[in-house]
Amino acid sequence: DKFAREAGMGFPGGPKIEKLAKGPELLDLPYSVKGMDMAFSGLMTAAKSKLDSGHSIETVTYSLQEHAFAMSCEVAERALAHTGKTELVLGGGVACNERLREMATIMTEERGVKCFIPSKDLCVDNGVMIGWLGHQMVSGNYEITDEDNRVHQKYRTDMVEVTWR
């Protein structure tokens, strides 16, 4: 979305970038992954610079998308390896992107782990995602005590007991 705004595409930028990302060549852009940390600021700045220097919007968006998703999949793969987890879930609006879905699916198949990608109508709205999770939890007879139903400052997603599968 940030690149799309700076390139004058407006909001939301993700779908517009995906539609344009058909460039014939992959430009050399910064790839910044350290452990499980990613930095996109240099990537965004370099992509805008490539656009400003005359590269086509299709080539720049293609290169930006490929780099950003390769970084994300690398970090996800590393997280799976370090934690021993056997499942990856994509979520949020970016999970609507077909290229990210493809890259995540390839990575998880190569690792022998499961990849869960909700239908696109469940990815575009945070309220819908939260509501769907609530539905799954209630349908799976998930119960929570008043004591557990409060804010936990250091709560981790891997602390959730998944009972609805």
What are the roles of these predicted feature ranges?
Residues 3-4, 76, 130-135:
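Buried hydrophobic packing segments
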Residues 9, 85, 113:
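Short glycine/serine/threonine/alanine-rich loop segments
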Residues 35-41, 46-89:
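Adenine-nucleotide phosphate-binding core of ATP-dependent small-molecule kinases
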Residues 43, 100, 127-130:
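Residues at alpha-helix caps and immediate loop-helix transition turns in enzyme cores, especially N-
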Residues 88, 105-129:
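Conserved phosphate-binding/catalytic loops in two-lobed NTP-binding clefts
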Residues 118-162:
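Glycine-rich phosphate-binding/hydrolytic loop that grips phosphoryl groups
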